[in-house]
C-alpha cells in the first residue's frame, strides 16, 4: 500500500498535467484556478486507497479519482456562489475573482468533465461505477437543497440535520470508496462496507467542520471563521444550543438570530460565548466520535489483511485532526 502522501503526489501531478485547450478559454480558466488551489485531495485519495486495498493498480483508478475531484470542486464552485463566500482555501472564490455567471457555467463544465473521466473505467464495471457516481451526485444535490430549505425554517431537528449532511457531504466520501473498491476488483458486498465506512466518516468530518467554523484559525481553516453564526446557518451547534438554552440565555440567543442589524464580530463573540456556556462543542465532539466508531466498525468487517486497513484507519485520524 502506498502512503497518503504518495497518492496525493500522484493526484496532484495528474491535475497539474491536465490542460484544457478547448475554447473559449474564459470557460476553462476558472476550472484550472480552482483545481490548482490544492487541498488534501481526500476524496480522490480514498478512491486510490480503496483500489489498492483490494489489490488493484492505482493508475487504473486515476481517471475516476480525478473525476471525483472535479465533481467535488464543481460543488464547491456552486456552493460558494449560493453562500456568497469570499474565500476558498484562503484565496478568492471563483465568483469573487470572475463573476457569478462565470462560476455557474464553469461549474457546469466541470460536472461534464467529471463524467468524461469516469467513463474511462474498465467496461466490465462501467455500469456499476456510473450507477454509484450518479446516485452520489444526486445525493449531494439533494443535501444542498435540504440545507437551503433549512434557511427558511426556524426549527430543524438533529435527526434532520444529520440526514442532510449525510447527503451533502458524506455520500461523496462513501461513493469515492465504493468506486475505488469496484475498480480494485472487490465483490459488491465488500465495496458496500467501504461505502458504510466512508459515509460515517463523512458525517464525522462535517461535524468537525461545524466546530472549525466557530473555533478554527482562519489561516489554517482556509475559510471565514464565524460565517455560520453570521448567516444563522443551521449547524449541529446552533440546533443543539437552541435545544438546551433556557430563560435569559434562550432570549439572548433568539435576539441575535432575529436581529439583522448587528455588528458581525460582536454576534460571533456573543453566540460563541453561549455555545461555551452550554458546552455545545463537547456534545458535537461526542457525536463525532460516535460516527468515527461506526466507520471503524464497518472497516473491521472488510475482508482484507489488517495491515492493509491500517492506512485507512490512519486516514480517518488525519481527516479528523484539522488544525484549529
Q: Which residues are covered by each model-predicted region?
A:
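All-alpha prenyltransferase/terpene-synthase fold signal
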Residues: 1-324
Amino acid at each position: 500500500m502506498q502512503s497518503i502522501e504518495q497518492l496525493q503526489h500522484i493526484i496532484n501531478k495528474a491535475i497539474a498535467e491536465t490542460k484544457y485547450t478547448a475554447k473559449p478559454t474564459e470557460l476553462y480558466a476558472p476550472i484550472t484556478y480552482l483545481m490548482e488551489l490544492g487541498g488534501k485531495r481526500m476524496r480522490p485519495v480514498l478512491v486510490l486507497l480503496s483500489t489498492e486495498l483490494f489489490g488493484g493498480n492505482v493508475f487504473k483508478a486515476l481517471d475516476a479519482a480525478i473525476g471525483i475531484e472535479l465533481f467535488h470542486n464543481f460543488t464547491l464552485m456552486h456552493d460558494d456562489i449560493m453562500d456568497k463566500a469570499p474565500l476558498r482555501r484562503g484565496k478568492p472564490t471563483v465568483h469573487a475573482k470572475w463573476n457569478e455567471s462565470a462560476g455557474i457555467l464553469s461549474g457546469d463544465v466541470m460536472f461534464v468533465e467529471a463524467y468524461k473521466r469516469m467513463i474511462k473505467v474498465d467496461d466490465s464495471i462501467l455500469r456499476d461505477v456510473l450507477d454509484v457516481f450518479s446516485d452520489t451526485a444526486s445525493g449531494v444535490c439533494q443535501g444542498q437543497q435540504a440545507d437551503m430549505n433549512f434557511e427558511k425554517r426556524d426549527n430543524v431537528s438533529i435527526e434532520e440535520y444529520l440526514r442532510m449532511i449525510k447527503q451533502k457531504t458524506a455520500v461523496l466520501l462513501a461513493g469515492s470508496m465504493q468506486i475505488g473498491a469496484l475498480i480494485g476488483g472487490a465483490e459488491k458486498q465488500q465495496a458496500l462496507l467501504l461505502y458504510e465506512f466512508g459515509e460515517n466518516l463523512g458525517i464525522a468530518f462535517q461535524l468537525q467542520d461545524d466546530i472549525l467554523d466557530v473555533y478554527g484559525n482562519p489561516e489554517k481553516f482556509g475559510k471565514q471563521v464565524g460565517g455560520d453564526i453570521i448567516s444563522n446557518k443551521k449547524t449541529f451547534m446552533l440546533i443543539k444550543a437552541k435545544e438546551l438554552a433556557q430563560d435569559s440565555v434562550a432570549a439572548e440567543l433568539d435576539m441575535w438570530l432575529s436581529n439583522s442589524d448587528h455588528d458581525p464580530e460582536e454576534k460571533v463573540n456573543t453566540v460563541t460565548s453561549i455555545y461555551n456556556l452550554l458546552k455545545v462543542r463537547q456534545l458535537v465532539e461526542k457525536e463525532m466520535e460516535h460516527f468515527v466508531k461506526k466507520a471503524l466498525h464497518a472497516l473491521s468487517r472488510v475482508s482484507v489483511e489488517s495491515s492493509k486497513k491500517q492506512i485507512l484507519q490512519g486516514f480517518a485520524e488525519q481527516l479528523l485532526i484539522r488544525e484549529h
